[in-house]
């Protein structure tokens, strides 16, 4: 599977075949290879079909959360702040919103806003972005996890 994950042509063929794509997102071994491949992550970030399949699969979501490519951005300080986390392509995987009374934050992927709860839990995002990833948050130790592509 690693050979397919690192070959853009082969990966595109898998993404364009619903049966093959469903087989991949259902397999922890296949998804581990995909989630470890920069080539695969870049292809997935540009495919709404692939993102939909991943979002519907607990196996695929867990593979992204365990990806060696995953980057964590942690909030420092207790104040409402908007930060641009990344310019360029990637996948916002999940966020930990540390508990705070007084409101929720948001994550923007290509200027599309998704609210997250500041309640001390991990919340899946699974949003691809092509140009930018930003976050509005308050509480120290809140952490946004994403895969740059």
Stretch-by-stretch model annotation:
Residues 1-70:
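Repetitive, compositionally biased segments used for assembly/scaffolding
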Residues 125-140:
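Noncatalytic modules at the cell exterior or secretory-pathway interfaces
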Residues 68-108, 136-149:
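Beta-rich globular "head" domains
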Residues 75-84, 110-128:
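Short, solvent-exposed S/T- and G/P-enriched segments that are highly enriched in secreted/extracellular
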Residues 7, 27, 57, 67, ...:
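Serine/threonine-rich low-complexity intrinsically disordered regions
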């Amino acid at each position: 599977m690693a050979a397919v994950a690192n070959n853009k042509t082969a990966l595109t063929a898998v993404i364009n075949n619903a049966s093959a794509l469903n087989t991949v997102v259902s397999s922890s071994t296949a998804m581990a290879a995909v989630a470890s491949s920069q080539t695969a992550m870049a292809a997935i970030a540009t495919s709404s079909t692939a993102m939909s399949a991943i979002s519907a699969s607990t196996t695929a979501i867990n593979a992204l959360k365990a990806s060696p490519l995953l980057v964590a951005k942690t909030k420092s300080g207790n104040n409402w702040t908007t930060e641009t986390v990344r310019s360029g392509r990637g996948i916002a995987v999940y966020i930990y919103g540390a508990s705070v009374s007084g409101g929720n934050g948001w994550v923007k992927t290509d200027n599309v806003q998704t609210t997250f709860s500041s309640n001390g839990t991990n919340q899946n995002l699974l949003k691809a972005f092509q140009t930018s990833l930003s976050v509005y948050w308050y509480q120290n130790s809140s952490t946004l996890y994403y895969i740059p592509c």
